[in-house]
Design a protein with these regions (language model features):
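Conserved NAD+-utilizing ADP-ribose enzyme module
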Residues: 2, 10, 19-30, 58-60, ...
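Glycine-rich loop/turn
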Residues: 14-66, 70-74
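Short hydrophobic-aromatic micro-motifs
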Residues: 3-6, 64-65
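Short polar catalytic/cofactor-binding loops
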Residues: 7-14
Length: 214
């Protein structure tokens, strides 16, 4: 499976020196910044572990792009999809990873997981569950961070069970899925043998601002 991922210059050196690169839990920005992100990242890690057993030395998977705006030809996409800040080298790697080691998901719907929201099939179900939460005087955040109350844990599980919809990358429901969707990929690590190509991008302040507007 052809994937594209962006790494820093330091990470590229680690890959060259160690022959592999995996997520450093201590440096992983999102799950360490906000507890809902940590819950979502752990959810993704657990799902990947179901199809490809996690190495003991890894906590979270690495991310890559499989499809952007409906296209899997990502050689010439907007560099904004790869570059996180200007005036810094970004190494874009084209990878070929065994599809049995990759978990694909809808990038748009993934944000529901990151923000702690359920993913329902239609507006009526959305509204009904919102009303239910209001009657319970319960916020989504409070439900997802709960660890003891059995009744709230049932609600937490109900919410997280809806997140499986992100893995239906061929879904057609217009309430959930866009026509030209973006699909992300997760896997445990990058090894030198799966790297097909390397491209270095370094955008100036002006180029970076322009890429954000494209």
């Amino acid at each position: 499976m052809i994937l594209y991922t962006a790494i820093t210059e330091q990470e590229y050196e680690q890959l060259q020196n160690n022959g592999k690169l995996y997520c450093n839990e201590k440096l992983a920005y999102m799950p360490n910044e906000y507890i809902l992100w940590k819950i979502a990242y752990q959810f993704m890690a657990d799902k990947l572990n179901n199809i490809d057993k996690k190495p003991d030395y890894i906590t979270y998977p690495r991310w890559a792009w499989y499809m952007i705006d409906g296209s899997i030809n990502l050689d010439n996409v907007n560099p904004f999809h790869y570059v996180s800040k200007p005036n810094e080298k970004t190494y874009v790697l084209k990878l070929d990873i065994n599809k049995n080691k990759v978990l694909l998901s809808d990038f748009g719907l993934w944000h529901c997981c990151l923000n702690g929201y359920p993913i329902w099939d239609n507006e009526n179900k959305d509204d009904a569950f919102d009303n239910f939460m209001s009657v319970c005087h319960l916020k989504y955040y409070d439900a997802l961070v709960e660890t003891e109350n059995k009744n709230i844990l049932l609600i937490k599980n109900k919410i997280m069970n809806t997140w499986d919809k992100i893995f239906n990358i061929n879904g057609k429901n217009p309430y959930l899925y866009t026509k030209n969707k973006t699909v992300q990929a997760v896997f445990w690590e990058i090894t030198l043998d799966v790297v097909l190509e390397k491209r270095i991008i370094c955008l100036s302040d002006e180029e970076y601002k322009y890429s954000m507007l494209m």
